[in-house]
């Protein structure tokens, strides 16, 4: 009976067949210890001289890393074994042998070497754990919104304009010289969806042509972007907190083994799963950052009216044991579509959610302008071509209502939950300013 490693605990004292690859091998006297991987996990298999045919024992002594195998044996519970279970091998069959020396040996390798061999590095424990947690988060995102009646709404990748009105766009030449751009966000289209279906979410790749080499930036990354008709700024933040606490709780519940493989202390994530996220206004956050800057020379001062940089977000988020909201930024440093604060029109009803431990922003959200004339004026003030946004203005001409939404960056969220130093490890094949291969 063929089984997978992630279900091995259900087959103790049973004869099973595993199909996978040799990850590591060592020998001690009359025992060969084989660490097998099958894509669902890692398992120790023991080949004992006298308990298998002599030809099998000799074969096991010469298997190179990444040999593809079929292995038959009995599952045993053994606390000494990695994972608490092992396979007592009865027989094995080589399916294929590596053609040459496998590049990623047991010695230490630098990150550039590992990224050059990302197609092979994905087979190792650390990327295995990260990708399993990423998969868990993606599944949980769909479950969260599905259970709350949201419609999955697919936004286009090719767009005629930028959402934020920036120049950080990847340009694509279409037929007859017409130009389009790879999407920076599905937000504008999600707004159309919200006014048709009340509550929607998009989930897909987005692209930013930023010449940035920081640990938080990729050229291609994934975002989930919900949008809800009649939702206020306060309700928007409540939904963000509900989502993030749900995601963290799900990983703690189902992926504790992978967190352990990464050396990630689950206790560091427990406050985020509880909710009760602190809230600071932009003004309060600037004041706190400047107090920190007086104590820490590595944190630059932040003049009021400027946006937070990575050092400011990191310093601020380290002061909290769970994500923290920063809300109501000056309008002049935020996007054209954000609703002004009725108590102070110089501010907007927006928020950023900063992950703790120095990870910084993982969500940006706002209430959207729903007044036609105000939105038209903002488009003009930002110097954007009104004809490109005419369809977007139609959303305000016909049945306009207050509405809100946000975008959660998947890779930044994965990096925080996994405790990664760089978002390049949070996606299977990172696309960066300095890297496009493999």
Curated annotation (Swiss-Prot):
Alphabetical UniProt keywords: Aminoacyl-tRNA synthetase, ATP-binding, Cytoplasm, Ligase, Nucleotide-binding, Protein biosynthesis
Taxonomy, superkingdom: Bacteria
Key word Aminoacyl-tRNA synthetase present: yes
Claim: Chloroplast is one of the keywords in the record: no
Catalysed reaction equations from the record: tRNA(Asn) + L-asparagine + ATP = L-asparaginyl-tRNA(Asn) + AMP + diphosphate + H(+)
GO CC aspect terms: cytoplasm
Cellular localisation: Cytoplasm
GO biological process: asparaginyl-tRNA aminoacylation
GO MF terms, alphabetically ordered: asparagine-tRNA ligase activity; ATP binding; nucleic acid binding
InterPro entries per UniProt: Aa-tRNA-synt_II, aa-tRNA-synth_II, aa-tRNA-synth_II/BPL/LPL, Asn-tRNA-ligase, Asp/Asn-tRNA-synth_IIb, NA-bd_OB-fold, NA-bd_OB_tRNA
EC code: 6.1.1.22
Subunit structure, as described in the record: Homodimer.
UniProt xrefs under HAMAP family: Asn_tRNA_synth (MF_00534)
Protein family according to the UniProt entry: Belongs to the class-II aminoacyl-tRNA synthetase family.
PANTHER family, A to Z: ASPARAGINE--TRNA LIGASE, MITOCHONDRIAL-RELATED, ASPARTYL/LYSYL-TRNA SYNTHETASE
Protein name (database record): Asparagine--tRNA ligase
């Amino acid at each position: 009976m063929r089984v997978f490693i992630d279900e091995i605990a259900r087959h103790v004292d049973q004869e099973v067949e595993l199909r996978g690859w040799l990850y590591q091998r060592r020998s001690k006297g009359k025992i060969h210890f084989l660490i097998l991987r099958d894509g669902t996990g890692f398992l120790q298999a023991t080949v004992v001289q006298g308990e298998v045919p002599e030809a099998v024992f000799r074969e096991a002594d010469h298997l190179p890393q990444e040999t593809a195998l079929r292995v038959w044996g009995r599952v045993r519970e053994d606390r000494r074994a990695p994972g608490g279970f092992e396979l007592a091998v009865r027989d094995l069959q080589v399916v294929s042998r590596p053609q040459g020396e496998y590049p990623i040996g047991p010695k230490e390798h630098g990150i550039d070497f590992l990224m050059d061999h990302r197609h092979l590095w994905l087979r190792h424990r650390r990327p295995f754990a990260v990708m399993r947690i990423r998969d868990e988060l993606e599944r949980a995102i769909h479950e969260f919104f599905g259970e709350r009646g949201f419609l999955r709404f697919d936004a286009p990748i090719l767009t005629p304009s930028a959402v934020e009105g920036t120049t950080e766009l990847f340009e694509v030449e279409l037929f007859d010289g017409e130009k389009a751009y790879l999407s920076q966000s599905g937000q504008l289209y999600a707004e159309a969806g919200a006014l048709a279906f009340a509550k929607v979410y998009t989930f897909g790749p987005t692209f930013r042509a930023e010449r940035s080499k920081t640990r938080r930036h990729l050229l291609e990354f994934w975002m989930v972007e919900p949008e809800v008709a009649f939702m206020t700024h306060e309700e928007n933040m409540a939904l963000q907190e509900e989502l993030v606490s749900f995601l963290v709780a799900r990983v703690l519940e189902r992926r504790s083994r992978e967190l352990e493989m990464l050396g990630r202390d689950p206790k560091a994530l427990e406050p985020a799963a509880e909710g009760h996220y602190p809230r600071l206004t932009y003004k309060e956050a600037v004041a706190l950052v400047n107090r920190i800057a007086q104590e820490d020379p590595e944190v630059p001062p932040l003049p009021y009216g400027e946006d937070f940089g990575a050092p400011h977000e990191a310093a601020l988020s380290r002061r909290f044991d769970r994500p923290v909201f920063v809300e109501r930024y000056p309008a002049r440093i935020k996007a054209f579509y954000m609703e002004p604060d009725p108590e102070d029109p110089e501010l907007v009803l927006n928020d950023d959610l900063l992950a703790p431990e120095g990870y910084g922003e993982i969500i940006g959200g706002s209430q959207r302008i729903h007044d036609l004339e105000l939105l038209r004026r903002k488009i003009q003030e930002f110097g954007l071509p009104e004809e490109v946004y005419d369809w977007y203005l139609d959303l305000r001409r016909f049945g306009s209502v207050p509405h809100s939404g946000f975008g959660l960056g998947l890779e930044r969220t994965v990096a925080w939950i996994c405790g990664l130093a760089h978002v390049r490890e949070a996606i299977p094949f990172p696309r960066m300013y300095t890297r496009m291969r493999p």
